[in-house]
Amino acid sequence: ASRWAQSARVGSILRAFGPGEKKLADPEADWFFFGGDMSSLPAISVNLEALKASAKGYAVISVPHETDKQSLLHPAGIQLIWVIDSAITKPSLALTEKIRSLKWLEGVPYPWFAGEFEGMRDMRRFFRDEMKIDRKNMYLSCYWKTGTPDEGMKKAKVLDALLDVKNFAAAL
């Protein structure tokens, strides 16, 4: 954007695009499992506010400092858990270990996780492979990848998806 601004002239057109569409959890799930780092905090917040008042489950959010915690509107049945992790700029197991340690509730959950690439991959293995949640009944996304600019992260995401499909097909 700064290069464009330096060469912009009166009448130049600027096109700005925001994030994609909202990725809301299935409201019909028996319970919910939200997880992510600070990059996913706005999306988790939107999801929590969209839930029915009777919703139950967990929202586990990793932030680097105690002062980064925020007041989030959420149903009383959703336990809000903050993981303080100063290693937020590199892959960290603190968030995913906390998620794995929580009690699995009764019924069919809807896992929703977004954040760093390696954390997303770990949560995909946990929810899909270990807990046997069908991929259509969860949302997983990486918003960033440690040490990689946006284009590199996008390439890693595509390659990961291709390898995941290949591994899935080989397992059939």
Q: Predicted regions span which residues?
A:
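Extended, composition-driven regions rather than compact fold-specific motifs
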Residues: 1-172
